[in-house]
């Protein structure tokens, strides 16, 4: 297989795009670097497409490697033919390849292998040939009676076992049946327990294999795993056996009757159970792939939430018996103070808690409260909103997801960062910092622990981790990282920076003071020329005398950027002050094509340079809608059908989205209630962090369920 041509076809790309991209990947370049700084070579492929192409490249190379192994194995058995070799070369998937190799694979003990060991292969061959004029099978079988094969029936049964395995091993037959089951099969589930709980809807359930939704596949799988459901695929057996008869029945002889019996046995005992397993595995793989994609998109939106900058913030980690942990964080994330208050039951020390928080607010000029969304959140919200009204000094609050905060606070990393604080106070610090800069704080946590997906614990963990790591890497490099303030964890997500290099950067910073230029990176231990090439453009040095060091312009393009300023009669001082009207006017006047030729760079690179010079130090997150901040609190009992509310999308899943509307319980907007037009998936319209207008459909206080709609009931 020509892998380059295959990728061109699958991704609808030009030959030069694929060839250049493969070379860049093989040369050890990172995806963020290729996406950002090699646009001319790739035709401006984005990082998501590059990751998909890279994953597919790995699969196809593994496929070719497997082909070589199978060819070697069959050749060693001296069974290779031109036809088999051609079939192997034409195989497009691992499944096709396994079907071809099945007859040659070393087998464990089977009924067919036992029959072969008894010398019944020639009898099976004679029966399978179904030649006219051949003696009846019963007569042929008499020649094979021995001490181990006591009678004709035993001989014929052994022959049928051999034929059954031959039919099962036929790649063409399996391909046809697999297609038929995929097209006409039905997934069924039945209750295996009186108490089905959340699986009640699957008690007597069926849905076509070809159309079953991924989230239902995963739900059924989980129900089966928990012993609540019995799951299988229903399929009309006659469709399959007719296909097999057409392939294996040659003449209408007495031997044909035995071949038909062998086919029937082969399908029921060998083929269908195997294909049923394969198809269910394929459905699960597709469902997991889709779920991982949703998880990745949700994680991306969570990481890319706009930071609430420039405010001293109090982080509140709510609790009942152990109290509410308090941490005061400066505008730059430094811990100023900590404590514990007890405004919730069983203590109810509300007045004492108000005095403590009021004192902290006045002492540090606090402007924001960040409240964790765990135990006792509602009581803490009520307490905070009452205090905000009493203080009347412009404070607002936001409930922050504390998913993963406990994992982080108990980690070795948190202990190194805050050795003086106990685990609970570290959580309060993390909650406050999540409001100030979600990306910088959340990179410290395993993205699987952030909890914005569905069935994440049922996913193949290796694939989930790889996908989420890619998402985190893409987000970090999209935003850029301040070289002088970033934690080792944030630095370690920058393209080309390993965890060891990240620690060395921090050590260099501590030993020599703040970086004053990007070029100083070259002095960091283990950060060689390749690593510098990959990471430099994503690291910012706001303190540098060179304005380009605080942009995403790569050092390799500095000469071109400076020449651009010269051509446009613009100074670095103009760029620092935001006086960019002349730059934009000159670029428009000369034209990007002519200007790119004059500077000897590609147009995409020129466009990126102009964009960066127009907004040095820009944060792409600042262009997104700001988080929804609150000053008052509601309870579920305050909600009424038809009530209009503003909310924040917290999670997007296959069947809808969960929206935080300011009560302790998130409400569900079912996919059918998102818009009046047809959508394939909620993510077509919504993403995590979106601020949306919703209307209450129904509230069930006992079950803690809130149904919402985004369709205006008044229209």
Predicted region positions:
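Generic start-of-chain signal for non-secretory N-termini
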Residues: 1-19, 26
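Long, highly charged, low-complexity intrinsically disordered interaction regions
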Residues: 3, 55, 62-79, 89, ...
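Duplex nucleic acid-engaging cores and interfaces of nucleic-acid transaction enzymes
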Residues: 49-51, 59, 63-73, 77-315, ...
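Structured, non-catalytic alpha/beta "coupling" segments that mediate domain-domain communication
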Residues: 73, 87, 100-101, 223-238, ...
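A glycine-rich phosphate-binding loop feature that marks nucleotide/adenosyl-phosphate handling sites
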Residues: 179-186, 316-320, 374-376, 400-407, ...
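Single-stranded RNA-binding regions, centering on S1/OB-family and related RNA-binding modules
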Residues: 544-545, 549-715
């Amino acid at each position: 297989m020509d892998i380059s041509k295959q990728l061109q076809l699958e991704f609808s790309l030009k030959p030069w795009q694929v060839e250049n991209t493969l070379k860049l990947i093989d040369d050890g370049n990172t995806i963020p670097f290729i996406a950002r700084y090699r646009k001319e070579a790739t035709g401006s492929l984005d990082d998501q497409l590059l990751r998909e192409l890279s994953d597919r490249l790995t699969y196809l190379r593994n496929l070719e490697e497997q082909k070589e192994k199978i060819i070697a194995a069959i050749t060693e058995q001296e069974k290779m033919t031109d036809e088999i070799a051609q079939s192997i070369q034409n195989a497009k998937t691992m499944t096709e390849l396994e079907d071809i190799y099945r007859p040659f694979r070393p087998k464990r003990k089977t009924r067919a292998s036992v029959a072969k060991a008894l010398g019944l292969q020639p009898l099976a061959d004679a029966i399978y040939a179904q030649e006219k004029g051949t003696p009846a099978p019963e007569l042929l079988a008499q020649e094979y009676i021995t001490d181990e094969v006591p009678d004709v029936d035993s001989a014929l049964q052994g022959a049928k076992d051999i034929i059954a395995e031959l039919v099962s091993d036929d790649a063409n037959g399996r391909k046809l049946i697999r297609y038929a089951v995929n097209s006409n099969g039905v997934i069924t589930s039945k209750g295996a327990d009186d108490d089905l709980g959340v699986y009640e809807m699957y008690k007597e359930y069926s849905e076509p294999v070809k159309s079953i939704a991924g989230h239902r596949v995963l739900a059924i799988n989980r129900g089966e795993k928990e012993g609540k459901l019995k799951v299988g695929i229903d399929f009309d057996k006659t469709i399959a056996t007719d296909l097999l008869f057409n392939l294996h029945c040659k003449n209408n002889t007495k031997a044909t009757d035995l071949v038909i019996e062998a086919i029937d046995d082969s399908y029921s005992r060998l083929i269908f159970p195997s294909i049923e397993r394969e198809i269910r595995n394929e459905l699960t793989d597709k469902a997991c792939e889709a779920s991982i994609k949703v998880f990745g998109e949700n994680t991306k939106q969570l990481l890319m939430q706009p930071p609430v900058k420039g405010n001293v913030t109090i982080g509140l980690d709510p609790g009942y018996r152990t109290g509410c942990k308090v941490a005061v964080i400066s505008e730059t994330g430094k811990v100023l103070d900590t404590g514990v208050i007890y405004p919730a039951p069983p203590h109810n020390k509300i007045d004492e808690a108000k005095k403590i928080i009021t004192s902290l607010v006045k002492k540090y000029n606090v402007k924001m409260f960040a409240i964790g969304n765990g135990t006792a959140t509602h009581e803490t919200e009520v307490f905070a909103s009452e205090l905000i009204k009493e203080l009347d000094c412009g404070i607002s609050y936001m409930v922050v997801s504390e998913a993963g905060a406990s994992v982080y606070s108990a980690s070795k990393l948190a202990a190194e960062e805050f050795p003086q604080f106990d685990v609970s106070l570290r959580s309060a610090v993390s909650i406050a910092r999540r409001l100030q800069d979600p990306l910088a704080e959340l990179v410290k946590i395993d993205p699987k622990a952030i909890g914005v997906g569905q069935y994440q614990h049922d996913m193949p963990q290796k694939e989930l981790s790889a996908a989420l790591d890619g998402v985190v890497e893409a987000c970090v490099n999209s935003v850029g990282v301040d070289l002088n303030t970033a934690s080792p964890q944030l630095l370690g997500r920058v393209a080309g920076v390993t965890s060891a290099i990240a620690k060395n950067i921090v050590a260099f910073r501590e030993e020599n003071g703040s970086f004053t230029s990007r070029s100083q990176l070259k002095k960091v231990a283990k950060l060689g020329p390749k690593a510098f090439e990959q990471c430099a453009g994503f690291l910012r040095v706001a303190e540098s005398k060179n304005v380009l060091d605080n942009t995403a312009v790569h050092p390799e393009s500095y000469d071109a950027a400076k020449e651009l300023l010269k051509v446009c009669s613009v100074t670095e001082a103009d760029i620092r002050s935001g006086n960019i009207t002349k730059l934009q006017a000159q670029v428009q006047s000369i034209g990007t094509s002519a200007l790119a030729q004059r500077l000897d760079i590609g147009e995409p690179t020129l466009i990126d340079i102009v964009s960066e010079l127009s907004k040095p130090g820009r944060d792409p997150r600042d262009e997104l809608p700001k988080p929804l901040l609150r000053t008052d609190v509601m309870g579920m009992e305050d909600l009424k059908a038809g009530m209009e509310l503003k909310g924040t999308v917290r999670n997007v899943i296959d069947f809808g989205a969960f929206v935080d509307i300011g009560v302790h319980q998130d409400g569900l907007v079912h996919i059918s209630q998102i818009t009046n037009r047809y959508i394939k998936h909620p993510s077509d319209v919504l993403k995590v962090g979106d601020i949306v207008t919703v209307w209450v459909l129904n509230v069930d206080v006992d079950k803690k369920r809130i149904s919402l709609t985004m369709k205006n009931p008044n229209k």
